[in-house]
Amino acid sequence: MKFTELTVKEFENFVQNPSLESHYFQVKENIAIRESDGFQVVLLGVKDDDNRVIAASLFSKIPTMGSYVYYSNRGPVMDYSDLGLVDFYLKELDKYLHQHQCLYVKLDPYWLYQVYDKDINPLTEKNDALVNLFKSHGYDHHGFTTQYDSSSQVRWMGVLDLEGKTPASLRKEFDSQRKRNINKAINYGVKVRFLSKDEFDLFLDLYRETEARTGFASKTDDYFYNFIEHYGDKVLVPLAYIDLNEYIQHLQESLNDKENRRDDMMAKENKTDKQLKKIAELDKQIDHDKKELLQASELRQTDGEILNLASGVYFANAYEVNYFSGGSSEKYNQYMGPYAMHWHMINYCFDNGYDRYNFYGLSGDFTENSEDYGVYRFKRGFNVRIEELIGDFYKPINKVKYWLFNTLDRIRNKLKK
């Protein structure tokens, strides 16, 4: 085996293998994004004796104190079950970094530490062997965190395993609320379409509304546009919406049908108890439809014919479709826009051969007092599998300068208080 810099083509060909479980940050499109942020990029990998790439990683070189912080965001990409390969990569990476002005290196591999069911019952053993291997190479583990951290990627995820399933069989695994709300969205006639680059402000409007409502930390407009600009068809932006003209027409047709059936039954003499109960039930349905019709007509008059309900940003790579971020309208929540969007994207996975639908981030704190308990409950209702990643690893390369860097950082933090 040999450790070497890779070409973009070598890197891209390697990470296209879905068995490597790579992340959307470890794709060639991210090179341009990192460079637009002002960072140099280097692709570092391992080739076997037949010159085939067996490990690869996109590193950002972040200028710091006359040196560089080397950061592999969700890398390196390799088969981490091959501990011999991991050992070789880390050993050779250390040699490379000592020769290339590295202050310290940060790795946060997209690899599992443990898997749980939706109720946090363990399904696999802990991957301590991998964590200990990193530590044996002098890496500090950031810990098994159970909260969001702005300096780290999420360490917990909710994932749907689609392999061997169909939309119908998968839906049977959802809880009653998920099934009911998906059905509501379908009955309302909610539609989903993908936004073009020129329409991305429709996503941002819903995202900013959700940000203001929930208080969650958010990304800048430029952050999103950077992905839209560079990721091409690897970024998907669905919009769930309702066309009130179509919905009102459907309601009116349904109302007319029920009124006609009620009138036909009322015209009959000597009605049975069963018929009287049916008439009473139709009267309830007619009253409900009239209220819905009035509300929809008023909304059309005040808010327009098209109501934008929910939107999201997704990344698709060789491994999975990943829900990155989203927003929804609280005013129109009765139409179940988020459910329509997720159900549409789950079906997109089936239609395009993906075996994983990743709802993505969770804090790892699954108690009722956690900051994202509502998010967990939402994802839990889809019968997700909870995946815990192994976390962040740091290693100082220039130890003297690294000590000085940390000392100055502590002083700056004290002065801010």
From Swiss-Prot:
Q: Which reaction does it catalyse?
A: MurNAc-L-Ala-D-isoglutaminyl-L-Lys-(N(6)-tri-Gly)-D-Ala-D-Ala-diphospho-di-trans,octa-cis-undecaprenyl-GlcNAc + 2 glycyl-tRNA(Gly) = MurNAc-L-Ala-D-isoglutaminyl-L-Lys-(N(6)-penta-Gly)-D-Ala-D-Ala-diphospho-di-trans,octa-cis-undecaprenyl-GlcNAc + 2 tRNA(Gly) + 2 H(+)
Question: This protein is called what?
Answer: Aminoacyltransferase FemB
Report the superkingdom from the record.
Answer: Bacteria
Provide the E.C. number(s) assigned to this enzyme: 2.3.2.18
Q: Please state which protein family the record places this protein in.
A: Belongs to the FemABX family.
The reply on keyword Cell wall biogenesis/degradation is: yes
- Which UniProt keywords are present, listed alphabetically? Acyltransferase, Cell shape, Cell wall biogenesis/degradation, Cytoplasm, Peptidoglycan synthesis, Transferase
- Entry's Gene Ontology BP terms: cell wall organization; peptidoglycan biosynthetic process; regulation of cell shape
Its localization reads: Cytoplasm
One GO MF term on file is: aminoacyltransferase activity
Query: What Gene3D superfamilies does the annotation carry?
Result: 1.20.58.90, 3.40.630.30
Record-level GO cellular component terms: cytoplasm
Protein's job? Catalyzes the incorporation of amino acid(s) into the interchain peptide bridge of peptidoglycan, using aminoacyl-tRNA as amino acid donor.
Q: Does the keyword Cell wall biogenesis/degradation apply?
A: yes
The gene name reads femB
Q: What Pfam families does the annotation carry?
A: FemAB
